[in-house]
């Protein structure tokens, strides 16, 4: 699987790249497709997850789940969306699955300095930890209040990539 900033999503089939989707995205600055992740249970559910910037009139970053059918991505399901974007830079954006099947998603601060990243009620400039339906994952620090319950860490400027360390002794 491969994605391009301009909205293209390809799959390698029989040694050839086959376009399976072309999303309507905003590509100004650092906008576009930010991350793609193949579901760990892909052989059973055929799910592909994409974090991207939507096109006008409401330009937002969106995490969506698609289903792979043949050589197409279909059935887009909205999982979460940021507020309207003000800047063209600092959108971050990386999707990783935890061993328990939950999702970690990094989001940039939309070049709004600390007004978004330090605000625990705003999902921009954060590390989010969610269930597959977009609900907050167990153990998040704001589950009892004081911020958006999907937030796992605050104060991130432009976290465009990260890794999860496998369990070790």
Where are these regions (language model features)?
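Beta-propeller blade signature
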Residues: 62-71, 118-133
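Conserved loop/turn at the beginning of each blade in beta-propeller domains
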Residues: 29-30, 87-88, 145, 152-156
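Blade/loop signatures of beta-propeller domains
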Residues: 13, 69-73, 133-145
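Short, well-ordered junction/capping motifs at the entry into regular secondary structure
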Residues: 111-112, 143-151
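A structural motif
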Residues: 96-104, 124, 129-138
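Repeat-solenoid scaffold signature
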Residues: 147-169
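Acidic, Gly/Ser/Thr-rich repeat motifs that build Ca2+-stabilized beta-propeller blades
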Residues: 1-114, 161-169
């Amino acid at each position: 699987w491969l994605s391009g900033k301009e909205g293209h999503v390809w799959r390698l089939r029989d040694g050839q790249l086959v376009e399976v989707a072309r999303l309507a995205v905003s590509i100004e600055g650092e906008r576009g497709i930010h991350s793609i992740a193949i579901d760990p249970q892909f052989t059973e559910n055929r799910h592909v997850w994409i974090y991207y910037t939507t096109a006008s009139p409401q330009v937002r970053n969106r995490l969506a789940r698609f289903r792979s059918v043949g050589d197409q991505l279909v059935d887009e399901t909205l999982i979460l969306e940021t507020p309207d974007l003000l800047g063209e830079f600092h959108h971050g954006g990386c999707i990783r699955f935890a061993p328990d099947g939950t999702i970690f998603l990094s989001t940039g601060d939309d070049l709004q300095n600390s007004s978004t990243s330090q605000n625990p009620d705003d999902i921009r400039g954060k590390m989010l930890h969610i269930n597959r339906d977009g609900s907050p994952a167990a153990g998040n620090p704001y589950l009892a209040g004081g911020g958006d319950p999907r937030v796992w860490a605050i104060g991130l400027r432009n976290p465009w990539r990260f890794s999860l360390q496998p369990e070790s002794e």
